[in-house]
Amino acid sequence: MSDNSQKKVIVGMSGGVDSSVSAYLLQQQGYQVAGLFMKNWEEDDSDEYCSAATDLADAQAVCDRLGIELHTVNFAAEYWDNVFELFLQEYRAGRTPNPDILCNKEIKFKAFLEFAAEDLGADYIATGHYVRRRDINGTTQLLRGVDANKDQSYFLYTLSHQQVAQSLFPVGELEKPEVRRIAAQLDLATAKKKDSTGICFIGERKFREFLGRYLPAQPGKIVTVDGETIGEHQGLMYHTLGQRKGLGIGGTKEGSEEPWYVVDKDLDNNVLVVAQGHDHPRLFSNGLIAQQLHWVDRLPLGAPLRCTVKTRYRQADIPCLVTPLADERIEVRFDQPVAAVTPGQSAVFYQDEVCLGGGIIETRLVD
């Protein structure tokens, strides 16, 4: 038996295939394994209730199959205060936040980590994220997952090296088809369950309708880059840079039939600015300013750094130069122009397979 037999790991069981296989792999590695199902949303919503009940039943079925205990905990208050309120605040300000990043920071790797250690006596927590970790020179690095299509390091850049050191990511070493194959071989209840794509913990629902419950819509003009009013939007919060669908406008009478894209949001005047064509110059930026910086395994940046950046999930890496500014912000200059750089989203930095950290995009640079 490996020396892992003295170590207790609590796996965050979501009711999905990745966390299910993670629990199995840790068992195979000799750890003492138990599961924890987190309930994070309390709003009165029958659809969500059904989905959460199904997820809990699936998590329980997997734990029964593997012969491990499943604990449950309610983090709804923490989620509301530390994730959802901030999410609404960002939308109110006309920015487009990423709730999954916030949720990982505040719930999965803070509330869960603390609860597992203090209440359940865990040495480690584990999740079904497609990332890896590496211990090197007395610190722990966060690495991209082996499966480039599923790599989730973009969503975990806010973790400290201490949090990474207390976390295990078993499926990060595998490709997704292999994870599905293992689940099928074990006849796990989640083997064929589709991946969730909704807002972290709130599930899949009609986003516009959902947001409208919490934020009053503020209709305004849709204006072309030349200043012509061509329609009305129902609220800037429903639109993001680079968006093409859902604008409700066709070609202009004398102009081209090329689709319209959102190229800017004038927050002061509540105006949505659009242009035709996916390669319109107004869609592109040469850089960005980022704030709320977090570096996984290093102190704040003291000198310019050559690395690569992603300004959204699943984007190809963009070579860039990162320069620290005086007020705990950074300026990032891309080697080539990048489309749809969106304030409120995260810019995440890499050197080869290592995720260095990132920050929130404050403004995009067009000069």
Curated annotation (Swiss-Prot):
Family: Belongs to the MnmA/TRMU family.
The species this protein was found in: Edwardsiella ictaluri (strain 93-146)
Protein name per its UniProtKB record: tRNA-specific 2-thiouridylase MnmA
SUPFAM superfamilies attached to this UniProt entry: Adenine nucleotide alpha hydrolases-like
Domain of life: Bacteria
Function according to Swiss-Prot or TrEMBL: Catalyzes the 2-thiolation of uridine at the wobble position (U34) of tRNA(Lys), tRNA(Glu) and tRNA(Gln), leading to the formation of s(2)U34, the first step of tRNA-mnm(5)s(2)U34 synthesis. Sulfur is provided by IscS, via a sulfur-relay system. Binds ATP and its substrate tRNAs.
InterPro entries the record matches: MnmA-like (IPR004506), MnmA-like_C (IPR046885), MnmA-like_central (IPR046884), MnmA-like_central_sf (IPR023382), Rossmann-like_a/b/a_fold (IPR014729)
Subunit text: Interacts with TusE.
Cell compartment(s), UniProt: Cytoplasm
Database matches in Pfam families: tRNA_Me_trans, tRNA_Me_trans_C, tRNA_Me_trans_M
Residues involved in ATP binding: G12, M13, S14, G15, G16, V17, D18, S19, M38, G128
HAMAP family: tRNA_thiouridyl_MnmA (MF_00144)
Residues marked Interaction with tRNA (site): H129, Q345
